[in-house]
Structures are given as structure tokens and as C-alpha cells.
UniProtKB/Swiss-Prot annotation:
Residues 32-64 form the LisH domain. Keywords: Cytoplasm, Nucleus. It is found in: Nucleus; Cytoplasm. The gene is gid8. Belongs to the GID8 family. Its main location: nucleus. Coiled coil: none annotated. InterPro entries: CRA_dom (IPR013144), CTLH/CRA (IPR024964), CTLH_C (IPR006595), LisH (IPR006594), Ubq-SigPath_Reg (IPR050618). GO terms for cellular component: cytoplasm; cytosol; GID complex; nucleus. Component of the GID E3 ligase complex recruiting N termini and catalyzing ubiquitination of proteins targeted for degradation. GID E3 is regulated through assembly with interchangeable N-degron-binding substrate receptors induced by distinct environmental perturbations. Required for the adaptation to the presence of glucose in the growth medium; mediates in association with the substrate receptor VID24/GID4 the degradation of enzymes involved in gluconeogenesis when cells are shifted to glucose-containing medium. This is GID complex subunit 8. Residues 70-127 form the CTLH domain. The keyword Transcription does not apply. GO terms for biological process: negative regulation of gluconeogenesis; proteasome-mediated ubiquitin-dependent protein catabolic process.
């Protein structure tokens, strides 16, 4: 858990007076440990790690916390997607949220596309280029993905790129095609499923901790884009 913390600031700035003012301002900001613990607990719940959330809450002595229902089921669905068991994930998803795939076309398309990628992976990695193996991929794409693609240009482009995997030998794949077949696609779709389930349940779909991290990155990029030199600081906290 997060216990007593100290903040050491190291800076680089345009002038000594600016640096001193910045250090004075940062040291005047009080960060309560309970707020930090709340951010961590919120992150664990959003990520679906119920056991870790409960353990952390107990160690941090947080009593007034809320863990939404079906966290384990949500985590199980995400883990199935990450392992490539797309059919099982879809079945579990339909059991948990029966209407989600009817109302969320992006999630439906991405899950079906990932299933197609798993079929293509069998052809590519096992070097099974038989007519039967390729036909299985083509039939799946025709029956499940082709009806969705015309309604969305992004879907159409994605499907065309995916089908290109069957048109070239793996040794000649471009970086874009290699990325399509990368296992990181599973992680990406699992994250999409996690967010979609949370939205469907009326819950927050991004942890406050990640929001702060993303905001910090955005500020850094904006400063760089506008050629603004920002004073850097490195927090050092003692964790107990």
C-alpha cells in the first residue's frame, strides 16, 4: 500500500528564479495518501482484478469502497480474448450482456475479425495453404464480416487489410501486414471488450489513474509541439 511519502523535485528551467518558484509551488501541493490509494483501487477495479482490489483495500485499510458486480466474469472474457479463444469469449459475453453485440457494432466486428485472424494464423504459422484451409477463412469472412463492412469504411479497410494476409507469403509481409497478425491485436480487442462491458453496465470505463497519466502525456506533447520548454520534475516516493 502507499504509506508515508516524500517528494524530491529536480528541475531544469529557463532561469533560477523560475525554477525556485516552480519548486515552491510543487512543494506546496499536498497529496493525501488516501487519495493515492483510492486511485490505485479504482485502477484495479477497472482492470477487473477483483482479488487484487480486495487485498489492496484491506492492506490500505479502505473500508468504504465499492466493487461492481460481474468483475470476475468481465476479467474471464478479457482473458479468453487474450488467449485467442474468441468463440468462448463471445459466448461468455452474450451470457453476461445479451444485447451488447447487437448494439455495439465495433466490438462485434473486432471480435469476428480477431476470430478470422486466428483462422488465418493457422494457415500462416502451420503453413497449411491447402484449398480447404484457405476456403475456411474465406467462408468465415464472407458469412460474418462482409455483411458488416459496407456500413463502415473503417471496417471495410480493416477487412481488406486482413484478407491481404492470404494473398502473399508471410516472408513478404509488409510492416502493416505483420502488425495485423501481431498478438497485440488480442490485447487491443480485450481492452475494447473491457471498456464496452463497463459502458454497458453504466460504469466508468477509464480509471482516474490512467486519465491522469494520459493528461500528463498530452501536456508534454502540446508543450513540445508549441516549442515550450517545461521544467521537469522527478518524484521520489518512499512506499511502505
Amino acid at each position: 500500500m502507499v504509506g508515508t511519502s516524500s517528494l524530491d523535485i529536480s528541475m531544469s528551467g529557463s532561469s533560477s528564479s523560475d525554477a525556485e518558484q516552480w519548486e515552491k509551488q510543487t512543494k506546496s501541493v499536498h497529496i493525501d495518501n488516501s487519495d493515492v490509494n483510492s486511485l490505485i483501487l479504482d485502477y484495479l477495479v477497472i482492470q477487473g482484478d477483483e482479488e487484487a482490489a480486495k487485498t489492496f483495500a484491506e492492506e490500505a485499510q479502505i473500508t468504504d469502497y465499492y466493487i461492481p458486480p460481474y468483475v470476475k466474469e468481465r476479467l474471464e472474457i478479457c482473458e479468453l480474448i487474450k488467449s485467442g479463444s474468441i468463440n468462448s469469449a463471445i459466448c461468455k459475453l452474450n451470457e453476461l450482456e445479451p444485447e451488447i453485440l447487437d448494439t455495439n457494432s465495433e466490438l462485434l466486428f473486432e471480435l469476428l475479425r480477431l476470430r478470422l485472424l486466428e483462422l488465418i494464423r493457422e494457415v500462416v504459422e502451420e503453413k497449411d495453404t491447402s484449398d480447404l484451409a484457405v476456403e475456411r477463412c474465406l467462408n468465415f469472412a464472407h458469412e460474418n464480416l462482409a455483411p458488416l463492412a459496407p456500413s463502415n469504411q473503417k471496417f471495410l479497410n480493416s477487412l481488406e487489410l486482413t484478407m491481404s494476409l492470404l494473398c502473399f507469403p508471410p516472408s513478404s509481409y509488409s510492416p502493416a501486414l505483420k502488425n495485423v497478425l501481431n498478438y497485440s491485436q488480442r490485447e487491443r480487442v480485450a481492452n475494447l471488450a473491457n471498456v464496452s462491458i463497463l459502458k454497458s453496465q453504466g460504469l466508468s470505463n477509464e480509471s482516474r489513474l490512467l486519465s491522469l497519466v494520459n493528461f500528463e502525456r498530452w501536456c508534454e506533447k502540446e508543450a513540445q509541439r508549441n516549442s515550450i520548454e517545461v521544467q521537469k520534475f522527478v518524484p521520489k516516493a518512499s512506499i511502505k
